[in-house]
């Protein structure tokens, strides 16, 4: 079998230059695709694009399927009428443009995204009614139905419990008692939908970026973590798929021994 030789550059989306604290899938990403094409490169290698948690690592994500809301481009949301420039342009996203301040992002980015969600609610379609915006909302929900509901519920519960590990949630929610979940869904329906909105917007921008890269002859080569994280929607919603104890904690873990980069070794 013959393979065509090709070359490219590794550039995490988070490392793209931008004015709002972290790289995004808008102009910064499209400009980088243009740079690759002009340089004769045909591959853009990225790191995993899943949501990051307290460790701020793309290899420790709370979902094997969801996208990182931090990568949603605010200017594109503004272009869609979901934000105005004054909603985010004057915010201090961190004092060092060369580094991502994840603490600041967590405190300020979601507040801006909630403004976008509030404006989205004024436009989103209502089942049974004719509306021009947006037809792909339901299509996305349908195509993501095997993971999105559990992820959104997980994030809403996590938010309501101070973002602690799901193994520290109230037992009824931790073990997914039907009555407890039904009660939580009824009381936090708006919060659950907020997390669905973020994934919808991520998906729209991600697909647009892929299409643009393909048009320019650039393939995006991704990466994924070796394991699903213990503190994830996947582990919480699919405990039967994992070897855990009665509390949901992994019975066995893996990693690698100490080396030059990690004196204490790594626990994956």
Region spans (language model):
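Conserved, mostly hydrophobic/aromatic
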Residues: 36, 46, 154, 213, ...
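Conserved, well-ordered alpha-helix/loop/beta-strand core segments that scaffold catalytic motifs
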Residues: 195-228
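Catalytic domains of carbohydrate-active enzymes, especially glycoside hydrolases
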Residues: 2, 27-52
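Hydrophobic faces of well-ordered beta-strands that scaffold small-molecule active sites
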Residues: 7-11, 42-45, 220-222
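Short alpha-helical segments and helix-capping/turn motifs at coil-helix boundaries
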Residues: 27-34, 139-140, 204-212
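Short, solvent-exposed turn/loop segments enriched in Gly/Ser/Thr/Pro and often Arg
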Residues: 45-55, 224-230
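Active-site mouth loops of central-metabolism enzymes
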Residues: 16-27
């Amino acid at each position: 079998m013959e393979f065509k030789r090709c070359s490219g550059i590794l550039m995490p989306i988070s490392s793209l230059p931008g004015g709002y604290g972290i790289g995004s899938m808008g102009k910064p990403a499209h400009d980088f695709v243009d740079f690759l094409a002009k340089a004769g490169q045909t591959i853009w290698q990225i790191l995993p694009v899943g949501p990051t948690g307290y460790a701020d690592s793309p290899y420790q994500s709370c979902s094997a399927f969801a996208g990182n809301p931090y990568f949603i481009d605010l200017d594109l949301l503004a272009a869609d009428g979901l934000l105005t420039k004054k909603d985010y342009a004057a915010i201090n996203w961190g004092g060092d443009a060369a580094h991502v301040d994840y603490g600041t992002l967590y405190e300020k980015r979601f507040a801006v995204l909630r403004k976008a969600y509030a404006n989205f609610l004024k436009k989103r379609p209502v089942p049974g009614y004719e509306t021009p915006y947006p037809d792909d909302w339901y299509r996305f929900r349908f195509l993501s139905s095997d993971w999105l509901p559990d992820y959104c519920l997980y994030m809403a519960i996590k938010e309501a419990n101070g973002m602690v590990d799901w193994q520290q949630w109230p037992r009824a929610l931790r073990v997914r008692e039907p009555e407890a979940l039904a009660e939580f869904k009824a009381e936090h329906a708006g919060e659950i939908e907020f997390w669905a909105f973020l994934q919808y917007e991520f998906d729209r921008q991600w697909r647009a970026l892929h299409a643009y890269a393909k048009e320019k002859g650039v393939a995006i080569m991704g990466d994924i973590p070796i394991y699903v994280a213990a503190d994830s929607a996947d582990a919480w919603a699919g405990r039967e798929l994992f070897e855990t104890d009665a509390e949901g904690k992994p019975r066995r873990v893996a990693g690698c021994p100490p080396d030059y980069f990690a004196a204490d070794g790594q626990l994956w």
